[in-house]
Amino acid sequence: MSRTLFVTTALPYANGSFHIGHIMEYIQADIWVRSMRMAGHTVHFVGADDAHGAPIMLKAEKEGITPQALVARYAAERPRYLDGFHIRFDHWHSTDTPENVALSQEIYRALKSEGLIETRSIEQFYDPVKGMFLADRYIKGECPRCHAKDQYGDSCEVCGAVYAPTELINPYSALTGAAPVLKSSDHFFFKLSDPRCVEFLQQWTTGANRQGVKHLQAEVQAKTREWLVGDDGEAKLGDWDISRDAPYFGIEIPDAPGKYFYVWLDAPVGYLASLKSYCAAKGLDFDALLDPAGPTEQVHFIGKDIIYFHALFWPAMLKFAGRKTPDQLNVHGFITVSGEKMSKSRGTGISPLRYLEIGMDAEWLRYYMAAKLNARVEDMDFNPEDFVARVNSDLVGKYVNIASRAAAFITRHFDGELAYDGDTDALAAEFAQQAESIRAAFEAREYNRAVREIMAHADRINQAFDAAQPWVMAKGIGAADAATRARLQDICSRALAGFKALSVMLAPVLPALASRVARELFGANADFAWGDAQQLPQRVAPFKHLMQRVDPKLLDDLFEPPAAEASAPAALPGGEALADTITIDDFAKIDLRIARIVNCEEVEGSTKLLRLTLDVGEGRHRNVFSGIKSAYQPQDLVGKLTVLVANLAPRKMKFGVSEGMVLAASHADEKAEPGIYVLEPWPGAQPGMRVR
């Protein structure tokens, strides 16, 4: 029976770029969403930037820009990461939007009408140097529970305790280091200690959704019980301060001038705001979709560091605002490197953008993460040697190897026609059973189990193929009898049918590769669905290279270099000092344009030059000579985009006239650091566009 699901990931804070932890969570959710869609379910998968709060306000202030400009800068980066790792959200939004303002204020008013909002005068820390009330994250001190030092003002990263900033021991301002002073201020509290909230949360945290799946994993349920019930068996939930004083970048509380919602109130509402924006764009009924009595399942993927907000505050807010409560909270751990916490200072930090920029295949990482992730709240360890071994052995050595070997025989001897000797019902039934087992593992988020089973199937296919030795039969196939030909065709057809079934099973993990297999190799006009595993293919196209092996040397470039010692002299960028400062007017004199390399050829008599024919959108072609012969083969440059100094005076050379200069980078000491790198714009740029 088809289901409707509303799926989210935790909102990234919009004061920085995505880190590898974000990408892990998005890949985990994306695999789940793709698998559910392959099963025929309707999934609305949305995300958003968490765009409010003091950190954004203060960072923008430091940079001399508005908070909105800061948020927009990071929002503009998001597609590069998401597209790069084949993460396909239906919609990406922001909490700094009219939808989120309206929904946050509606929920607040509903809670207030239920008698769950209370105004209290509190003493709040104030930084006398900065001249502002301090948000929780800008107060540090000793945890009142476990006495760990340098903990934030709202929660302890060591023991997980949640507390009021005034409970910290020896607090200090994280902005100025000054000892904060206490000032009185009226604040608004969500009465989480109300017996109605306590009773609901005790039921919800131990309950299950209509599929029979628990709302919370066992480890998460145990943790919430610690927060819900004291040693004496009595409820111990504290009320939640949901307000902050101006100056603050956020959503104003209705009828309370100078008061704003704490970011953790409006941030999760951003899930709903993103869906509402998506529904408006697609003509869907948002209210009907999230009707508390309706069939839609609400599923959140989050990290283990934000359980408290999602397992207690969020469900209670929704429940008593008359809205749908979450059906499932999927919590994951952190990423470690070779068993240790990632650290830039130790050179074990992984930048997702660096991963893409050095040419590593996004689907290598998707596969590796799938092979390590499960439904428990466990950290995922990235081990470089294990990464290389798994990708090269599993994906290339086992999976891709099946198609590369079997398709060659079918193409060469049978013109791409597949044929099976005998009854194929058992084979189709076997694939269907295997696919259902894998589908169930993905739905249960036991990705590592799914990957193990898939590779076990690949092993069996390879073993059967090797045992049959089709290469021996193929040697004399031209003079072979019909039975031998049929036997060879059957062996290869069954191997390719198995490869197709494996591709269906891997499609949630390797969406780009599986799409190529479906469309290019087997001639399908759509991507795989789970039911395609049991449909035996009848034709195969000539095999094309599917996946490159991992070069272990790439891993040397992947990790962010360790921070330099403070005493070490600063290295010159690119081996040379920066040029003297110029004005914007000086720069404006240079007309840089996007150019397409229409043709490229060697220059007879020159050991350094290549002759480039460039289209700069002028209606004619330009001739440019460039000293890049040592770094590029002419055929590799044809069709590429590059950057041209378009208003450089033509230069008459021995070999002709050069009408501009193509930009390329190199180190000042070319002997010590050889290499020339022609600038290439991102896809989407067009010839003639000016570089500003």
Curated annotation (Swiss-Prot):
The UniProt keyword set, sorted, is: Aminoacyl-tRNA synthetase, ATP-binding, Cytoplasm, Ligase, Metal-binding, Nucleotide-binding, Protein biosynthesis, RNA-binding, tRNA-binding, Zinc
| Residues spanned by motif 'HIGH' region | 12-22
Q: Where does Zn(2+) bind?
A: 143, 146, 156, 159
Q: What is its main location?
A: cytoplasm
Catalysed transformations (reactions): tRNA(Met) + L-methionine + ATP = L-methionyl-tRNA(Met) + AMP + diphosphate
| InterPro entries noted in UniProt | aa-tRNA-synth_I_CS, Anticodon_Met, Met-tRNA-synth_bsu_C, Met-tRNA_ligase_1, Met-tRNA_synth, Methionyl/Leucyl_tRNA_Synth, MetRS_core, MetRS_Zn
Which compartments is it annotated to reside in?
Answer: Cytoplasm
Q: What class of enzyme is it?
A: ligase
Motif: 'KMSKS' region; annotated at 341-345
* Subunit structure as annotated in this protein's UniProt entry: Homodimer.
The name on file for this protein is: Methionine--tRNA ligase
Record organism: Bordetella pertussis (strain Tohama I / ATCC BAA-589 / NCTC 13251)
